[in-house]
Amino acid sequence: LTPGKIIDYGLRDSMNMGACMAPAAADTIRQHFEDFGTSPDDYDKIVTGDLGKVGQRVLLDLLQTSGIDLGERHMDCGIEIYDCKKQDTHAGGSGCGCSAAVLCGPLLRDMHEGKIRRMIFAGTGAMMSPTSVQQSQPIAGICHAVVLERSGA
């Protein structure tokens, strides 16, 4: 378990929550590697909750500046929940349902089938309310991460 901390980059656009949450995800993932002495190569997948395409790009750029390249290991549930080519979803899905559906569906199935042995699952969240959005207050992000590992053969 890697508990995250609230990260506020001062972003105020409630229509771009992925970018608001990405700095928290980057901080938590970076902290996880530091705390456990691991690197992206130690995991089959590094999964975030619902950053979408824009937030994913921010996450990857922030980690790259720290010398961390997630490469093809990164997956975002907000992107995976839709077929963006067929469904015109723009940035992808948003909300905790993305994490739940993708984790409990394809990810755990792939673990059961042995396609994924070890993954970081980093749930993302935005700290906001209707009132804070109406008042144009900054939207902070939070992210906590767990490692899921397949036991046995």
Can you say where each PLM-predicted feature lies in the sequence?
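A structural signal for small-residue-enriched, beta-sheet-centric alpha/beta enzyme cores
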Residues: 21, 37-40, 47-57
